[in-house]
Amino acid sequence: MKYNNLENDDSDIHNNNNNNESEGDSLIELEEINLEGNNNNDINNNNNINNNNDSLDYENNKGSKKKNNKKYVILNEEEDINDKKVENGENETSSFTYGHDNEFKDLPLPKKGFGGLKSLEENANFLSSMTYLWADKFVLYCFKNILQLDEIWELASYDKSSYLFDIMDKNWQNELKNSKKPNFMKAAFKSFGKHFALSWVHFGLNVISQFIGPIFLKKIVSFVIQYRENPGSVDPNLGYYYALILFVNSMLGSIFLYQSNMITSRTGNRLKSLIVLYVYKKSLKLTNSSRSKKSNGEIVNLMSNDAQRLLELFQMVNTLIFAVPMIIVSMILLYDCVGWPSFVALLVMGISLPYSLNRGSQLSIYRRKLVGFTDQRIKVVNEMFQAIKTIKLYAWEDYFSQKMMSKRGEEIKFLTQFVRFRYSLIVVVQSIPTIISIFMFTVYYLVNSKLPADKIFAAVAYLNIIRVPFTFLPYGYNIYIQFKVSIERVVNFLNMDEINQGDDKNNEINVNVCDQQKQQQTDIGIYMDNTTFSWAIKPQTNPPPPRTTPSNDKSSPSGNNSNNEKKEVQVSFSLKNTSCQVKEKGSLLMVIGPVGSGKSSFCQALLGEMELENNGSLRVVGSIAYVSQSAWIMNASLKDNILFGKEYNKERYEMVLNCCALLPDLALFPQGDLIEIGERGINLSGGQKQRVAIARAVYSDSDIYILDDILSAVDAHVGKHLFYNCIKGILKEKIVVLATNQLNYCPYSTQTLILKTGGEVEQYDTFENIISTINSAYGNSSLFSELLKQYAHMAGDSDKDSDEIVDDEMIKSKENNNDLYDGKLTTIEEREEGSVSFKHYMYYVTAGGGFLFLIALLGYCIDTSTSTFTNWWLSNWSSKHTSTGINNNNSSSSNSISSSSSYIIDSLSSLNINEDGDIENAGEFLGVFIAIGVLTVLLIIVRTIVFFEYSIRATTEIHKRLFWSILRAPMWFFDTVPLGRILNRFTRDTDIVDMLLTNSLNQFLNFSTNCIAILVIISIATPWLLLPMTPIIILFYFIQYFYRRTSIQIQRIESITRSPIFSHFAETLNGVITLRAFRKMGENVLKNQALLDDNNKCYLTLQAMNQWLGLRLSVLGNLITLLSCIFITVDRSSIAIASVGLSISYTLSLTTNLNKATQQLAELETKMNSIERISYYTENVPQEPDQIIESNRPPMGWPSLTNSNHTPPIIFENVVMSYRQGLPAVLKGISFEIKAGEKIGICGRTGSGKSSLLLALFRIVELSSGRIIIDGLDISKIGLKDLRSQLAIIPQEPVMFTGTLRSNLDSLSEHTDSELWDVLKEIQLYEHVKKVSVADEGLDLRVNDNWSQGQKQLIGLGRALLKKPKILVCDEATASVDSLSDELIQRIIREKFKDAIILTIAHRLNTIVESDRIMVLDSGSIVEFNKPSILAQNENSLFNWLIDETGTQNSQYLRSLIKH
């Protein structure tokens, strides 16, 4: 626990005894505690334990330890803090803790809202379930409160992903075994067939109710006609009966519909979740060759967009399934109404069908291409923002923005084609009902010379039924096409080869091992017999021609490689004919060799990651702990990273912290080991990340430890501590495989494996037997031989440990942790409250062009008006015949339309009817009817084209704004925002804007304008209906208002719960080798399931709210229909027959249109949540200063560094820097000058400020005060690109990007091929490139993840050589290379940059002792800055102390290198 205030007499902390982890103790650092007046806080100390192998003494149980005037106190949490007493404490209040992940995790805190309760739906009775009454109190709660995730009830047991997976996996495994072409959906139907069937039954009953409605509409119209003809022959109450039957029928239909919707949504979400889970599990098992075919971005796309396609399909699957039956039944009933003219409708649909099918097939083709380009875009985004710091340091923003825009441009090109085909299909199907109406009624009139009202309006009702499936058919077919492509991609991924690492239960890795070998090799150990392992990579397409002159083309040289995945996988690096056997406890196998020899590959071969190429065998028996060269860190607390799912054991935990030298680090953290490390360990230095990874391995208490160059990321002193206290200490009884460049530890090995360039084993023997013949391992290199012999003699020196553990890399943590007083680095994801703001709608409207949107909106209004006017004209036409045939004497009072709106009738036409009842000007009437229909179709075409153009512009502009906003964000933004959260904007949110938002907006505008038109028609036809409709409309408003306040909150939470799924997935992909080595795949699958369940409970709650709303709106719509029928029955003697049919037909469709309009509004709001999230980033993310300031650009040749004006080239003047405003300074008034050509070495104690100095120079962090001057220019006054492009850095953690070797060396295409080859020769990668090139790829060799860290650092050096900078920064540039390569790099830097200013930060003092001056930093200030010879002679110098700490012989060697 953390106790921030120990000075309060009344402090009282209650602990939960049920917390399993609270059984241990908490280690708290008490510094300078004020004891005055605090007699109750007295802590007794006892049981001191000293560890001779380490300078860090700690006390067990209630003990204490002094170090640097700090006291470490162990508290037993079962005792109250007030019962402790502090002895000899100093006056300081900072503290740190370890041992308790969450002190209040298991406390029975009261749950707010419905949190922790069983699902309300699961507990609902039959009536409540059918009518969604159970959701009423939840809607009311959301209306009054701001909803939080923990206030939503628990997910129902039958919706939990683990339960669903168990059901599905049986059928999927059978499908894989028994089918040549496994069908995921077939397995899904077997698993959830009853749910599909139940949904179809409910929807089918709803469809039946839809067809019953027009039947009773016809009966009501007939009732009025018969009553008018002969009142005595008809029961006057018959109209009320029909009205009641119509109401009950509509109510039952609504109940069935919304039950069907909920079942379908639940089933679709289940399958979507299963796809996400299957993709996640599969990504944990892919072989290297399979993995090389799929980038992280492509796999993320499967989880986000492809899984979503299935969910979208299920939202309209019932409409799609019943579309054809509904059309067929409608045609039969239509034939019953109008006779053979109904075949005109069939003919029109038959003609349009081939066109629709053709468009559908084109949609499928373009969707497949579009998905491929989407994968490429996401791949670039993922890679960019994972390496954003490198991109900023190299000033590569423009290059990567062009690369990104190129990918997005290709995606938009196919998106445009896709949307064009989709909208052309929409135009056809939306126009078909109008075209059918024109032709059918025209033919009917020409044949029968009349239009009977009862038949015509029944026909109109059936056409309205047809209109719904026809309207949704293009959307549904479009989604089906996308789904078909997506499910094909998912199945292809699930069918990829899986790695076979042996028996998880028995902790074995078996590769090509026979039963006899298993019987012989039963002891814990490593048994490798004549194996040749290889990596597999994707070959490149035909390489471009070589460059003889620098290219002006700044686009990505690897931009046109979208077809690469179709190529066969070819072998790159291989580890040849390797044999070894390690089975004795306490064995230490050391693997050494030059850069690129295969040390890391050997480690991964032992893990079963490489592919066996011959008949050899590998068997690893026992549990394995693995530490990679680049430490993999989880986004969790430091403690969670160490425990890694194992039970907390206080004694071992303390021992691990001690031997991994982590105790001093905990002193820097406000929350000790509870500190949140951050994504990719961003909150820790390289050395700290490595030590946390080592601590994780040590705590696991495994049988075999595979350690890949773990000492490179720490300084020599900490390296010694780790070697003697971990490898030769706590792990002395374990089998350890250590790949290393630290040759001074070779004498301690029991076996040594020497690899040479190309992956061949040079020697495998004891170190003593090897030392005499070592020269041959490196081509008889006398330099390497001398170094190895020197290290062998120095090894004895290393036994001595000092009283201090000083990790130079620890600085970063202290600097970063000024940012972390609460121990939290990752920010909480932003979330707006209330309904979607109007400004977000305007954001979307203006993005596509406000004028275009207004034209489209006007098109919807006019289109709906003309469509409605067509039916009104039809009703007016039929009324002339009906009125003539019934009672000409009542004509003056029978037409309510004329009486209520005579100005409309008078202005439209003046119809003369002859004695036979024929319309004299029928030709004019027919001509107007056709003209209106044609105008309606033309308007549909025009507004669709305009809307299409608008949507493409909008999505293009929004993505551009998002990309540039994040690219220009300061570095702290990426340190505090998880990558998964950023990726979510570029995947799911962008996909919604690209594909779904325009659909929702289109349909909302369509249905809402329909509702307005219907209300206008009803008010004209039956104006007395407006009075009872008013309270219904008011009630309608409040219901939808309550709903929207609920739905938008749930949608926002759903979006937020989606981000951790992506973050966890990205984290898993980066650490999959570590997870497999520790056999932690199962635990991470459980975590994935938990994250899915959180997201699913939000989604299903949202869907339940949708059905709640829909049913209640249906009730209101059905009430309007009931009232309309009642009023018609009451006014049966005077109402116009045309008004009867028009009013009822439109009230019937009003229910559907109101529901659809409100649902689409809700859907639009949920989709607009993506606009909210994107606009938040585009409008609220802080931006870096301008890349270029035209008014203050540096002169050509800047910086010249010629000293022409007699001023130092680099001047720091009173530099003060904080990571953010309001945080403590990490650089405190630093001032110094650097002369032209000077070589400056920078070192210092923990938290000294070295990294901060570097960040200030590159303006990664802006200064709080002071200034930095380079060659006479204040760098804060010039653009970032102008500054950073003139500096060069060789980073500690080098990055190679997807693409070619050429693009990685010369991203800006500024150099010729010959220059690039020359650099490769200088950094000694020329032969390696020639060897691994396929088909003479050369510089166009495609790079992959199999390049070693050392090789990547050499590429970083190559970039600097090509750039020829005036100022070079080396940030531990030789950390991951062997001694020979270290010497090579140092020699190249000395020779090639002899005139440049060089700033070198290093753990290894040998890399800086030959500098002109040494700068020693401490606590953000310069404490020493002088020549190394002067500092080394000063006994009180910190630099002199650091030299002495390397050991007697090594310190003598270092002093011999110092210039005098």
UniProtKB/Swiss-Prot annotation:
<feature type="domain" description="ABC transmembrane type-1 2">
    <location>
        <begin position="853"/>
        <end position="1166"/>
    </location>
</feature>
<dbReference type="GO" id="GO:0005524">
    <property type="term" value="F:ATP binding"/>
</dbReference>
<keyword id="KW-0812">Transmembrane</keyword>
<dbReference type="InterPro" id="IPR011527">
    <property type="entry name" value="ABC1_TM_dom"/>
</dbReference>
<feature type="binding site">
    <location>
        <begin position="593"/>
        <end position="600"/>
    </location>
    <ligand>
        <name>ATP</name>
    </ligand>
</feature>
<feature type="transmembrane region" description="Helical">
    <location>
        <begin position="1014"/>
        <end position="1034"/>
    </location>
</feature>
<dbReference type="GO" id="GO:0030587">
    <property type="term" value="P:sorocarp development"/>
</dbReference>
<keyword id="KW-0067">ATP-binding</keyword>
<dbReference type="InterPro" id="IPR003439">
    <property type="entry name" value="ABC_transporter-like_ATP-bd"/>
</dbReference>
<protein>
    <recommendedName>
        <fullName>ABC transporter C family member 5</fullName>
    </recommendedName>
</protein>
<feature type="compositionally biased region" description="Low complexity">
    <location>
        <begin position="37"/>
        <end position="55"/>
    </location>
</feature>
<feature type="region of interest" description="Disordered">
    <location>
        <begin position="37"/>
        <end position="68"/>
    </location>
</feature>
<dbReference type="InterPro" id="IPR003593">
    <property type="entry name" value="AAA+_ATPase"/>
</dbReference>
<dbReference type="GO" id="GO:0016020">
    <property type="term" value="C:membrane"/>
</dbReference>
<feature type="domain" description="ABC transporter 1">
    <location>
        <begin position="560"/>
        <end position="783"/>
    </location>
</feature>
<dbReference type="InterPro" id="IPR036640">
    <property type="entry name" value="ABC1_TM_sf"/>
</dbReference>
<keyword id="KW-0472">Membrane</keyword>
<dbReference type="Pfam" id="PF00664">
    <property type="entry name" value="ABC_membrane"/>
</dbReference>
<dbReference type="GO" id="GO:0140359">
    <property type="term" value="F:ABC-type transporter activity"/>
</dbReference>
<dbReference type="GO" id="GO:0042626">
    <property type="term" value="F:ATPase-coupled transmembrane transporter activity"/>
</dbReference>
<keyword id="KW-1133">Transmembrane helix</keyword>
<feature type="region of interest" description="Disordered">
    <location>
        <begin position="537"/>
        <end position="567"/>
    </location>
</feature>
<dbReference type="InterPro" id="IPR044746">
    <property type="entry name" value="ABCC_6TM_D1"/>
</dbReference>
<feature type="compositionally biased region" description="Polar residues">
    <location>
        <begin position="551"/>
        <end position="563"/>
    </location>
</feature>
<dbReference type="InterPro" id="IPR050173">
    <property type="entry name" value="ABC_transporter_C-like"/>
</dbReference>
<feature type="domain" description="ABC transporter 2">
    <location>
        <begin position="1210"/>
        <end position="1444"/>
    </location>
</feature>
<comment type="similarity">
    <text>Belongs to the ABC transporter superfamily. ABCC family. Conjugate transporter (TC 3.A.1.208) subfamily.</text>
</comment>
<feature type="region of interest" description="Disordered">
    <location>
        <begin position="1"/>
        <end position="23"/>
    </location>
</feature>
<feature type="transmembrane region" description="Helical">
    <location>
        <begin position="425"/>
        <end position="445"/>
    </location>
</feature>
<dbReference type="InterPro" id="IPR027417">
    <property type="entry name" value="P-loop_NTPase"/>
</dbReference>
<dbReference type="GO" id="GO:0016887">
    <property type="term" value="F:ATP hydrolysis activity"/>
</dbReference>
<feature type="domain" description="ABC transmembrane type-1 1">
    <location>
        <begin position="196"/>
        <end position="482"/>
    </location>
</feature>
<keyword id="KW-0677">Repeat</keyword>
<feature type="transmembrane region" description="Helical">
    <location>
        <begin position="842"/>
        <end position="862"/>
    </location>
</feature>
<dbReference type="InterPro" id="IPR017871">
    <property type="entry name" value="ABC_transporter-like_CS"/>
</dbReference>
<feature type="transmembrane region" description="Helical">
    <location>
        <begin position="238"/>
        <end position="258"/>
    </location>
</feature>
<feature type="transmembrane region" description="Helical">
    <location>
        <begin position="1108"/>
        <end position="1128"/>
    </location>
</feature>
<feature type="transmembrane region" description="Helical">
    <location>
        <begin position="922"/>
        <end position="942"/>
    </location>
</feature>
<dbReference type="GO" id="GO:0055085">
    <property type="term" value="P:transmembrane transport"/>
</dbReference>
<feature type="transmembrane region" description="Helical">
    <location>
        <begin position="320"/>
        <end position="340"/>
    </location>
</feature>
<keyword id="KW-0813">Transport</keyword>
<keyword id="KW-0547">Nucleotide-binding</keyword>
